[in-house]
């Protein structure tokens, strides 16, 4: 195991900057997930750690050693890619041992490591098979095993589940989580799938256009996003946003006017520092935090546009006439409502988020469980 530290790391191709002044501390044994939309720089960041991309400026440390100029093979890292990249003419055992053979490891060492890793990954009964005789999930486990037998101090995974179907992704996600708990290795995992990030990570790094938008535990990012980008990216369905105007402030409270015909005002328990009366801001509320109208004091009303029945839950898309914008309301169980009907939902102030015009969040003061 080893820690990984990035200090003011920047990557540029000519005048195009793809990673901007990245500062990160990844502790020994942590499972850290880099997440963000396509083009945010997450894979580039992973490749700089692996040594497959040069660092334009800044410093990378693995353990106590500065690694900027160290060749990839000498960094003590192992990498699993989106593509399995298995040799089709070699057996599972031969694929897993290929790197060790090239490194000149003794036969008994190779056999011992391959057998140990095969047991961990439930591949022992498949060691003599060729890749064409394996399922997608089994092939991905072989690719992971090939990296594990080298015993890297840092394990890098670049969207390893992207080629799998939905059921296999869930299965492999569970297996990777178990593998980390069993081995305790430092793992850095890249994905665009925020569900993978939330379920796997000890710590999530959200990237936006080459910069670190926020670093934190999964529930911390979900309940206390640093800005509107993180709020909209973490969570599915994504957070609803409403334009509001500040009408008053007090200690640890901000009053805003909702975009409804009755101009209803509501006090939100958020930090009021630097918030000016009259400012235009965005109120955020997650679909699952909206309430049935009969148990709420603050009511939003609109016309049902779409009803999505998922069996275990219902998602209702409601158009708010005054802003010509849809809100998504999610409720567990079945909700029977017709498209075109008028539908009212409740807005709980303690679950609301408030964002300034520049996108930064006013810190929520409501204490959420698990954070």
Curated annotation (Swiss-Prot):
Target for inducer exclusion, mediated by the unphosphorylated enzyme III of the phosphotransferase system for glucose and resulting in the inhibition of maltose transport. Acts as a repressor of mal genes. In absence of maltose, the C-terminus of MalK interacts with MalT, then MalT becomes inactive and the mal genes are not activated. In presence of maltose, MalK is tightly associated with the MalFG complex and has no affinity for MalT. The gene is malK. GO terms for biological process: maltodextrin transmembrane transport; maltose transport; negative regulation of maltose transport; negative regulation of transmembrane transport. Keywords: ATP-binding, Cell inner membrane, Cell membrane, Membrane, Nucleotide-binding, Sugar transport, Translocase, Transport. Changing residue 106 to C: Suppressor of EAA loop mutations in MalFG. It is a peripheral membrane protein. This is Maltose/maltodextrin import ATP-binding protein MalK. One of its GO terms (molecular function) is ATP binding. The lineage of its organism: Bacteria, Pseudomonadati, Pseudomonadota, Gammaproteobacteria, Enterobacterales. Changing residue 346 to S: Normal maltose transport but constitutive mal gene expression. Pfam families: ABC_tran, TOBE_2. Changing residue 117 to M: Suppressor of EAA loop mutations in MalFG. Residues 4-234 form the ABC transporter domain. Changing residue 119 to K: Resistant to inhibitory effects of alpha-methylglucoside but retains transport capacity.
């Amino acid at each position: 195991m080893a820690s990984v530290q990035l200090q003011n790391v920047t990557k540029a191709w000519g005048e195009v900057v793809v990673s901007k002044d990245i500062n990160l501390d990844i502790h020994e044994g942590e499972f850290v997930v880099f997440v963000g939309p396509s083009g945010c720089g997450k894979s580039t960041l992973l490749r700089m750690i692996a040594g497959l991309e040069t660092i334009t400026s800044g410093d990378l440390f693995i353990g106590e050693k500065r690694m900027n100029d160290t060749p990839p093979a000498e960094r003590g890292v192992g990498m699993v890619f989106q593509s399995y990249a298995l040799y089709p003419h070699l057996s599972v055992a031969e694929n897993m041992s290929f790197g060790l053979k090239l490194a000149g490891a003794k036969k008994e060492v190779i056999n011992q490591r391959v057998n140990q890793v095969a047991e961990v990954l439930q591949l022992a009964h498949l060691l003599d098979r060729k890749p064409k005789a394996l399922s997608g999930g089994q092939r991905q486990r072989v690719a992971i095993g090939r990296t594990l037998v080298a015993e890297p101090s840092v394990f890098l995974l670049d969207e390893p589940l992207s080629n799998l179907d939905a059921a296999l992704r869930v299965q492999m996600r569970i297996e990777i989580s178990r593998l980390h708990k069993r081995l305790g290795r430092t793992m850095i995992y890249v994905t665009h799938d925020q569900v993978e990030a939330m379920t796997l990570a000890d710590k999530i790094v959200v990237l936006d256009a080459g910069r670190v938008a926020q670093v934190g535990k999964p529930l911390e990012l979900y309940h206390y996003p640093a800005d509107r980008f993180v709020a909209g990216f973490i969570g599915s369905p994504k957070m609803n946003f409403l334009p509001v105007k500040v009408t008053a402030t007090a200690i640890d409270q901000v009053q805003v006017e909702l975009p409804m015909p009755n101009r209803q005002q509501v006090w939100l328990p958020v930090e009021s520092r630097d918030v000016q009366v009259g400012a235009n801001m965005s109120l955020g509320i997650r679909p699952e935090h909206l309430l049935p109208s009969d148990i709420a004091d603050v009511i939003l009303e609109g016309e049902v546009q779409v009803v999505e029945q998922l069996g275990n839950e219902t998602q209702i898309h409601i158009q708010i006439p005054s802003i010509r914008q849809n809100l998504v309301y999610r409720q567990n169980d079945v909700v029977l409502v017709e498209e075109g009907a008028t539908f009212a939902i409740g807005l709980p102030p303690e679950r609301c988020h408030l964002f300034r015009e520049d996108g930064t969040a006013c810190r929520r003061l409501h204490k959420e469980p698990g954070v």
